Amino acid sequence: MAKEDVIEFSGTVTELLPNAMFRVKLDNDHEILAHTSGKMRKNRIRVLAGDRVNVEMTPYDLTKGRITFRYK
């Protein structure tokens, strides 16, 4: 999948789930499941409930996403 095929949203982490999964409430009031990106795992960036994050989603499945950035 090319970089142009992703859709970016902002949201808030509402719940931590097993296997490094998170429930994220987007700014448009949709809730999705998301996991952290590989660079965030490699650099051990912790994501906690209540954190503001950027989420990348594919247009083919709008219920799952990848957390790419955590705001301070």
Curated annotation (Swiss-Prot):
Main function: One of the essential components for the initiation of protein synthesis. Stabilizes the binding of IF-2 and IF-3 on the 30S subunit to which N-formylmethionyl-tRNA(fMet) subsequently binds. Helps modulate mRNA selection, yielding the 30S pre-initiation complex (PIC). Upon addition of the 50S ribosomal subunit IF-1, IF-2 and IF-3 are released leaving the mature 70S translation initiation complex.
Annotated protein name in UniProt: Translation initiation factor IF-1
GO cellular component term of the entry, any: cytosol
Pfam families documented for this protein: eIF-1a
Top-level taxon: Bacteria
Domain S1-like: start-end pairs: 1-72
InterPro entries according to UniProt: NA-bd_OB-fold, RNA-binding_domain_S1_IF1, S1_domain, TIF_IF1
Keywords: Cytoplasm, Initiation factor, Protein biosynthesis, RNA-binding, rRNA-binding
Xref: SMART domains: S1 (SM00316)
NCBIfam families: infA
Localization of this protein: Cytoplasm
Subunit structure: Component of the 30S ribosomal translation pre-initiation complex which assembles on the 30S ribosome in the order IF-2 and IF-3, IF-1 and N-formylmethionyl-tRNA(fMet); mRNA recruitment can occur at any time during PIC assembly.
Family label: Belongs to the IF-1 family.
GO molecular function, one term: translation initiation factor activity
Main subcellular location of this protein, as a coarse class: cytoplasm
